[in-house]
UniProtKB/Swiss-Prot annotation:
Its main location: cytoplasm. It comes from Geotalea uraniireducens (strain Rf4). Its cofactor is [4Fe-4S] cluster. This is Dual-specificity RNA methyltransferase RlmN. S-adenosyl-L-methionine binds at G157, E158, S189, S211, L212, N213, N287. One of its GO terms (molecular function) is rRNA (adenine(2503)-C2-)-methyltransferase activity. Residues 98-325 form the Radical SAM core domain. Specifically methylates position 2 of adenine 2503 in 23S rRNA and position 2 of adenine 37 in tRNAs. m2A2503 modification seems to play a crucial role in the proofreading step occurring at the peptidyl transferase center and thus would serve to optimize ribosomal fidelity. The active site is at E92 (proton acceptor), C330 (s-methylcysteine intermediate). GO terms for cellular component: cytoplasm. One of its GO terms (biological process) is tRNA methylation. Disulfide bonds join C105-C330. InterPro entries: Aldolase_TIM (IPR013785), Methyltransferase_A (IPR040072), RlmN_N (IPR048641), RNA_MTrfase_RlmN (IPR027492), rRNA_lsu_MTrfase_RlmN/Cfr (IPR004383), rSAM (IPR007197).
Length: 343
């Protein structure tokens, strides 16, 4: 019988597994705390479980782990981690320091199938989904080295295209017996998979970020093929329907591209589009990269766009580019570090 990777289980699933072994369900909480609060890497580390029970677990289950194969540091303090998976594929995570908090950007897929024109990861194509264990092990590995305050699913892949495993990881991240992250500290970003947005909202409580990036279907169809399946009207309706706890907002991510979506007319349309959605806007100046003809917006167009939103009482920040010198900035993850390691 093939052993199960115990890190693929949520607490509820682990309780069922332990009960199936003829043991008390509360043992699952003990194991969970060892895995995610004590970073136990072997059952032998779990000293409040009997030796016999630990030996029984080893017969049917195992504990997966990831260690960074390479770490690249940016001049601004950002760090990019390369993780080699058991099948030889690789994913990247990015740790972004910011005064009193650090944010870890994690991957949910090897590659991505969304094909967004401005995103380097999209040229990598989709190889496969990550398992729940492979997602949470990115967090385990980085937390061994650095404190992590916030988690964002904004690395490689479309999280909602791997909904089951992402939801499993979210439950582990926010479980009081797991990583203990506040749901306010965990954000899932999507390019706009409308049915899965509803499923996510019904499954877990987390922050939602929506990669909007255009104010007309014509432009969004061109730069984000997913819009042909779920156009703006459907996407914005899904945003409005997404269940939010009090005093929470959906983050509208808007990658500004010169001559494509950075005009004042775009700013005016954006205000109208999100007027009835509890939201805040993140303006993200496009990060130029090889193989893409798009250009970064001018500072003048960024400033005017930002000011227009502020004047219309929209909560807005312009995100500074972090880690661009190590290809760790928004839209730049594509395994450059993996290639460097192999070479």
């Amino acid at each position: 019988m093939e052993k199960v990777d115990i890190k693929n289980f949520t607490l509820q699933e682990l309780e069922a597994y332990i009960a199936g072994q003829g043991k008390e369900r509360f043992r699952a909480k003990q194991i969970f705390k060892w895995l995610y609060q004590q970073d136990a890497r072997e059952f032998a580390d779990m000293t409040n479980l009997s030796k016999d029970f630990r030996q029984e677990l080893e017969k049917t289950a195992w504990i997966s782990n990831l260690d960074a194969e390479a770490v690249e540091a940016s001049a601004d303090g950002t760090k990019k981690y390369l993780f080699r998976l058991a099948d030889g594929n690789a994913v990247e995570s990015v740790l972004i320091p910011d005064e009193d908090r650090t944010t870890l950007c994690i991957s949910s897929q090897v590659g991505c199938a969304m094909g967004c024109e401005f995103c380097l990861t999209g040229t990598f194509k989709l190889t496969r989904n990550l398992t729940t264990a492979e997602i949470v092990n990115q967090v385990c590995a980085v937390k061994r080295q650095e404190p992590v305050r916030n988690i964002v699913f904004m690395g490689m892949g479309e999280p909602l295209a791997n909904l089951k495993n992402v939801v499993g990881a979210l439950k582990i991240l926010t479980d009081p017996d797991g990583f203990q992250f506040s749901t306010r500290k965990v954000t899932v970003s999507t390019s706009g998979l409308v049915p899965e947005m509803a499923e996510l909202g019904a499954s877990v409580t987390v922050n939602l970020a929506v990669s909007l990036n255009a104010t007309t279907d014509e432009v969004r169809d061109r730069i984000m093929p997913i819009n042909r399946r779920y156009p703006l009207k459907e996407l914005l309706a899904a945003c409005k329907a997404f269940p939010l706890p009090s005093r929470r907002w959906i983050t509208i991510e808007y990658v500004m591209i010169r001559g494509v979506n950075d005009s004042l007319d775009d700013a005016k349309r954006l205000v109208r589009l999100i007027s009835n959605i509890p939201s805040k806007v993140n303006l993200i100046p496009f990060n130029e990269h090889d193989g893409c003809t798009f250009q970064a917006p001018t500072q003048d167009s960024i400033d005017k766009f930002h000011k227009f939103l502020l004047d219309k009482h929209v909560t807005v920040i312009t995100r500074s580019s972090r880690g661009s010198d190590i290809s760790a900035a928004c839209g730049q993850l594509k395994g450059r570090l993996d290639k460097a390691v192999k070479d």
